[in-house]
């Protein structure tokens, strides 16, 4: 029981701490000092799903009118089947600007970013993630190749460095990034912007920046003082702290459950020692007869119990 209990406690606590660290790393991969602004209310059934989407001009207004900001990236998304080299792959197609790479801590593995002319003109060019490259191009060079998103043929101008799994279990590398004008004009046929990604300066007051963004967007969306916000501003740092706190609580709960095995093991040792005392009555009587003190006999059995527990704990540590 002690072996199993000790091993279970160590394993559960280690797994919990590992999960906490993984969550922190994945949240940090979303971007440093990052705010995500999305349409819809933060709380409540439906979450404001009918709220008006943003416009690209909203991102420009935030970037120019609010201090403490490094970059603002408008983001539009669409799922689509991507075709290249006779292979098909369903992926997430993202429309944005070069600021999207900065806000998300993305690095270029090969190739280049979008040029200003390509962004203005909505050129048929794209950057792809590692998963899309692997599924569509295999071992061949993807940079300079053509791929088709729906009916639009795009030239691959860059390959993004791999980031792996995201904080919510999604594959961050399974994506195609193109200029937002290209996505809106040629893929979705509308000017909706799903998310505004705001990267703040180091040391910026996230609370103040959030309040300034909220006030600016309320004015731009013409909300009355009595109207609730039809958008929400999420601080990824706070999200990371919340998720880390949740995983820590789960770690403690798992450790407590595993500790029950230790309790059961302790009860088992107690029962064994009781049986041992019964079977060794003659030995105890002989020791008392030749002058041993009662506390010395008790100490002997206590040492035996501690030795059994320690041995079981050591074996449990080794097994864990």
Predicted regions and their residues:
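Peri-transmembrane interface segments
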Residues: 213, 225-258
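Transmembrane alpha-helical interface segments in multi-pass membrane proteins
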Residues: 1, 8-12, 255-320
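Extracytoplasmic
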Residues: 30-34, 49, 54-57, 67, ...
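Alpha-helical membrane-protein architecture signal
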Residues: 55, 236-239, 243-246, 282, ...
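Structural beta->alpha junctions
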Residues: 41-53, 83-89, 159-164, 189, ...
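Mid-to-C-terminal secondary-structure elements
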Residues: 98-114, 123-226
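Hydrophobic, regular-secondary-structure patches
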Residues: 13-92, 99, 117, 134-135, ...
């Amino acid at each position: 029981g002690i072996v199993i209990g000790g091993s279970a406690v160590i394993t559960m606590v280690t797994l919990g701490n590992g999960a906490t660290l993984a969550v922190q790393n994945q949240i940090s991969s979303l971007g440093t000092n990052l705010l995500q602004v999305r349409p819809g209310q933060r709380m409540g059934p439906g979450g404001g799903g009918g709220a008006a989407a943003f416009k690209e001009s909203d991102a420009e207004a935030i970037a120019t009118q609010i201090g403490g900001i490094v970059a603002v990236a408008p983001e539009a998304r669409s799922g689509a089947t991507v075709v290249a080299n006779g292979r098909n792959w369903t992926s997430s197609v993202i429309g944005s600007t070069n600021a999207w790479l900065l806000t998300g801590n993305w690095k270029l593995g090969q190739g280049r970013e979008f040029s200003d002319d390509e962004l203005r003109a909505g050129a048929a060019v794209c950057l792809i993630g590692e998963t899309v490259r692997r599924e569509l191009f295999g071992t061949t060079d993807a940079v300079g190749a053509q791929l088709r998103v729906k009916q639009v043929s795009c030239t691959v101008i860059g390959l993004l460095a791999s980031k792996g799994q995201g904080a919510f279990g999604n594959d961050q590398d399974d994506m195609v990034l193109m200029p937002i004008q290209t996505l809106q004009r040629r893929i979705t046929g509308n000017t909706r912007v799903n998310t505004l990604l705001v990267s703040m300066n180091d040391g910026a007051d996230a609370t103040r920046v959030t309040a300034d963004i909220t006030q600016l967007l309320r004015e731009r969306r013409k909300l009355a003082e009595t109207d609730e916000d039809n958008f929400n501003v999420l601080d990824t740092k706070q999200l990371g702290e919340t998720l880390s706190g949740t995983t820590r609580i789960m770690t403690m709960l798992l450790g407590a459950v595993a500790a029950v095995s230790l309790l059961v093991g302790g009860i088992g040792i107690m029962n064994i020692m009781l049986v041992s005392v019964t079977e060794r009555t003659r030995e105890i009587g002989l020791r008392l007869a030749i002058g041993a003190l009662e506390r010395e006999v008790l100490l002997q059995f206590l040492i035996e119990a501690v030795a059994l527990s320690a041995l079981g704990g050591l074996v449990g540590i080794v097994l864990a």
